């Protein structure tokens, strides 16, 4: 650069970024060595401010609506230019990274940030390659300018901040927001659009593998247990949130983890606890007077986070990929207290529950959500991140399950014995015992009983689990009230599913109101 021009740091190290972030006052060093940063008013994603540029190359393949909102191509170019001009006067951080741990399906990404801690986040969450863009692909660009204030009347945005994806130009623009999760979810959305065209199923799931190479997937919305359950001391982690399932195997889309921190404990989540050290970014975590993180403090948000590279986990799959999965787990957090802790699904039921995506928003990751826990249906267990119509992903899932003969399970990490506020939530040790039975294969052909209203098969016994918990009616003091709530939930499933054009076999696989 010319003399006097602001510096640009290319591929800076974690130590450099921590040092600069502290010098600039972007964050504080904690007692465990992590860097804690605050994101201001926006402590979660801002779905109302997320757009996709409407242009000929992708327009026909995107399901436009409240999730995927169109943005004018000319307005995007003008705004990109304004943000670039703003950043030209700033000290910048640039890294050459990749998204997708697969030689065929990776995307090269050049990430430019105004903040040092945002660059540390990107380097933790994306993949640092030995040789950047070895396949000479078109390079994606992310620019993240939290200090740029959007003007809706000038820029065509919804507010003072914006997230825009542009498939034709391979660009992601983030302006006016500090919440770092927008960066990772933007590139997830990009891969969710591109991978299906190559016959690869992109998934909002975690994945781990056993000593014998047996892979398990955990689908679920934020707060349902993806990160916690995949961080198993007895198994090797592939990744905690974003994966692709191609013919022959599963690969991580990322190079790090973005774990929820609320109520984190060393006893229940030792793998995550030990990963939080120097180089980790703690987002919106409160500290005590000795700089010790207080993970119980939700005064800023329920959505406090830790972003760390996979290298911080001792028991990980170094290749960042695994075999095709023998077991697939759909995690649901049922606030009604009606669903059993585990059900064994047929292929048709798997398609039904994948499309339904029934769960709860727990410590919601989205701005504008109340702190109250509420039930929701989120297609593919990740509706905010999937640009194509839901049927595209469901068809790919059925195809992959059938070709590899994977067994799918529905696991409730929510409530039993009554709805939220009356019943109690399944504890982590109980769910871990269920998952142990799933990954061992002992549940696949276990004797079951059929729950008529829910149309689900539940095992009669699981080692290490109180058998009275397995049929949820046993945990309710008032059996008539259980029947009422079960019927009500079945009706909610049916009315939500009415919008899908699917085979009669899949329609009949749902609850019977």
From Swiss-Prot:
One of its GO terms (biological process) is gluconeogenesis. GO terms for molecular function: ATP binding; metal ion binding; phosphoenolpyruvate carboxykinase (ATP) activity. Mn(2+) binds at residues 185, 204, 241. It holds the Pfam family PEPCK_ATP. Binds 1 Mn(2+) ion per subunit. One of its GO terms (cellular component) is cytosol. Substrate binds at residues 45, 179, 185, 305. Gene3D superfamilies: 3.90.228.20, Phosphoenolpyruvate Carboxykinase, domain 1, Phosphoenolpyruvate Carboxykinase, domain 2. Its EC number is 4.1.1.49. Its cofactor is Mn(2+). The keyword Manganese applies. Pathway: Carbohydrate biosynthesis; gluconeogenesis. Disulfide bonds: none annotated. It catalyses: oxaloacetate + ATP = phosphoenolpyruvate + ADP + CO2. Belongs to the phosphoenolpyruvate carboxykinase (ATP) family. Monomer. This is Phosphoenolpyruvate carboxykinase (ATP). It comes from Shewanella denitrificans (strain OS217 / ATCC BAA-1090 / DSM 15013).
């Amino acid at each position: 650069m010319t003399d006097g021009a602001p510096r640009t740091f290319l591929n800076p190290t974690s130590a450099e970024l921590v040092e600069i972030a502290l010098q600039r006052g972007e964050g504080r060093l904690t007692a465990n060595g992590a860097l804690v940063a605050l994101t201001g008013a926006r402590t979660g994603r801002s779905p109302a401010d997320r757009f996709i540029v409407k242009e000929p190359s992708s327009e026909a393949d995107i399901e436009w609506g409240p999730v995927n909102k169109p943005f004018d191509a000319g307005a995007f170019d003008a705004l990109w230019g304004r943000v670039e001009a703003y950043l030209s006067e700033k000290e910048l951080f640039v890294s050459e990274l990749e998204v997708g741990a697969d030689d065929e399906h990776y995307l090269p990404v050049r990430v430019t940030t105004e903040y040092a801690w945002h660059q540390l986040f990107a380097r933790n969450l994306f993949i640092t390659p030995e040789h950047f863009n070895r396949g000479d692909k078109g390079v994606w660009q992310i620019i993240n300018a939290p200090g740029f204030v959007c003007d809706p009347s000038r820029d065509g945005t919804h507010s003072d901040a914006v997230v825009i994806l542009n498939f034709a130009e391979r660009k992601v623009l983030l302006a006016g927001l500090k919440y770092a999760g927008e960066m990772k979810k933007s590139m997830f959305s990009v891969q969710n659009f591109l991978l299906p065209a190559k016959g690869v199923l992109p998934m909002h799931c975690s994945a781990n593998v056993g000593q014998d190479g047996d892979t398990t997937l955990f689908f679920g919305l934020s707060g349902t247990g993806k990160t916690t359950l995949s961080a198993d001391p007895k198994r090797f982690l592939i990744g905690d949130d974003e994966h692709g399932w191609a013919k022959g195997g599963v690969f991580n889309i990322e190079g790090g983890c973005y774990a929820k921190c609320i109520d984190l404990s060393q006893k229940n989540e030792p793998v995550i606890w030990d990963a939080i050290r120097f180089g980790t970014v703690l987002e919106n975590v409160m500290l005590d007077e000795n700089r010790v993180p207080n993970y119980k403090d939700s005064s800023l948000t329920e959505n406090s986070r830790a972003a760390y590279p996979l290298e911080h986990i001792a028991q990980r799959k170094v290749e960042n990929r695994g075999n095709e999965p023998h077991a697939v787990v759909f995690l649901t957090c049922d606030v009604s207290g009606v669903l059993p802790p585990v059900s064994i699904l047929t292929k048709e039921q798997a398609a039904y529950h994948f499309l339904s995506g029934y769960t709860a928003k727990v410590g919601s990751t989205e701005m504008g959500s109340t702190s109250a826990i509420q039930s929701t249906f989120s297609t593919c267990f990740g509706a905010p991140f999937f640009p194509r119509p839901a049927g595209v992903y469901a068809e790919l899932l059925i195809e992959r399950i059938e070709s590899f003969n994977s067994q799918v399970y529905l696991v409730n990490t929510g409530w039993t014995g009554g709805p939220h506020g009356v019943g109690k939530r399944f504890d982590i040790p109980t769910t871990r015992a269920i998952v142990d039975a799933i990954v061992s294969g002992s549940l696949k052909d276990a004797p079951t009983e059929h729950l008529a209203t829910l149309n689900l098969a539940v095992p009669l016994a699981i080692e290490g689990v109180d058998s009275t918990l397995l049929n949820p009616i046993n945990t309710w003091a008032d059996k008539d009230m259980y029947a009422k709530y079960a019927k009500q939930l079945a009706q909610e499933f049916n009315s939500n599913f009415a919008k899908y054009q699917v085979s009669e076999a899949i329609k009949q696989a749902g609850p019977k109101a």
